[in-house]
Amino acid sequence: MIDAGRRLFVEKGYAETATPEIVAAAGVTRGALYHHFEDKKALFQAVITSEAQAVAKSIEASSAPGDGPRVALIAGASAYFAAMAQPGRTRLLLMEAPAVLGWPAVAALDAENAEVSLRHGLAALLPEAGGLLGPLTTLLSAAFDRAAIAIEAGGERRDYEKAIAALVDGLADQLRR
């Protein structure tokens, strides 16, 4: 059901997807859908959670244990952009999810997934960040999301990867002064 829901949510959007379409695509009864999910929104939440976890796994797998903090952070950035290039993922996570689930729910989900890796990477690279670690994580996470949207719209991924590296290097230089 999650796969069928994902396909339809990507193709039509949440609002335009009806539960009869989902059950038909999944090859199950409506009763089966409601046995597993309270409603369409709960199914959508499961789809979004699965997508967020997939992105986080890609980021976590992107660096080797011996990589230094900067190398690991830049590899994680590249992995994030690669994971977000999965067809429909940017739309689901960055456009549909906030509209359907609300920003607090999406922020909490991100905090449990991709943002965890970003926070750890920044903490390793910028131990002098101190109390700025939280705000820096939030700001860079937003920059990553905007870059993913721009890349999906036709922007050059390589340019955004270079820009993220420049931002990270600039932060490191500034905080070490």
Tell what function each PLM region has.
Residues 31:
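Key DNA-contact positions within bacterial/archaeal DNA-binding proteins
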Residues 84-104, 149:
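Amphipathic alpha-helical segments used for helix-helix packing
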Residues 19, 41, 45, 49, ...:
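Short, structured helix-loop boundary elements
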Residues 1-9:
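Short hydrophobic clusters on alpha-helical segments that form packing/core surfaces
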Residues 53-56, 71, 75, 101-130, ...:
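Amphipathic alpha-helical packing segments from all-alpha helical-bundle domains
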Residues 46, 57-88, 136-140:
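Hydrophobic alpha-helical connector segments
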Residues 2-3, 15-16, 27, 36-60, ...:
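An amphipathic alpha-helix adjacent to DNA-recognition modules
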Residues 8-21, 37:
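Short helix/strand-capping hinge loops at secondary-structure junctions
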